């Protein structure tokens, strides 16, 4: 992996390492003392059902209720140290479902979820998570290095 020249090569090597070291098997099991897997499974099933049935009011309530940074201890660093690539599949599925649900709420029009309510919901959601920032320090001496970092992130 240290000799990988691009992300795809590194990812393939990391996945192979996880397969050989047992990380892939660990990833597939929901159970772990490091997070509340029952709560996450329950919330995932609830979000999927509400989205499938188009119950926007309950979906918005459920999202708002569960959108805080460490629901079920999912931000526990231990969960991100067992594998070189990824974490528990349940966490990945849950976060993907939350993201897809937020995308749907943003991109689609719903008669029972007017634009003003949608805007308030996303403003409150943004306040729950805060705002990310990229801070590059070191002044002009690291300017060229920072340019490379920005270019890599942009592409």
Functional labels for PLM-detected ranges:
Residues 1-155:
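Patatin-like phospholipase
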């Amino acid at each position: 992996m240290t000799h990988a020249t691009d992300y795809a090569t590194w990812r393939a090597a990391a996945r192979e390492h996880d397969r050989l070291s047992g990380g892939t098997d660990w990833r597939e099991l929901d159970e772990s003392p490091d997070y509340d897997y029952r709560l996450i499974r329950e919330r995932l099933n609830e979000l999927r059902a509400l989205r499938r049935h188009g119950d926007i009011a309950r979906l918005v309530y459920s999202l708002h209720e569960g959108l805080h940074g460490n629901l079920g201890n999912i931000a526990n660093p231990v969960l991100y140290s067992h594998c070189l690539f990824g974490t528990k599949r349940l966490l990945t599925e849950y976060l993907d479902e939350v993201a897809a649900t937020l995308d749907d709420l943003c991109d689609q029009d719903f008669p029972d979820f007017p634009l003003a309510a949608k805007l308030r919901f996303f403003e409150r959601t943004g306040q729950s998570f805060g705002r990310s920032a990229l801070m590059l320090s070191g002044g002009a001496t690291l300017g060229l290095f920072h340019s490379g970092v920005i270019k890599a992130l942009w592409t």
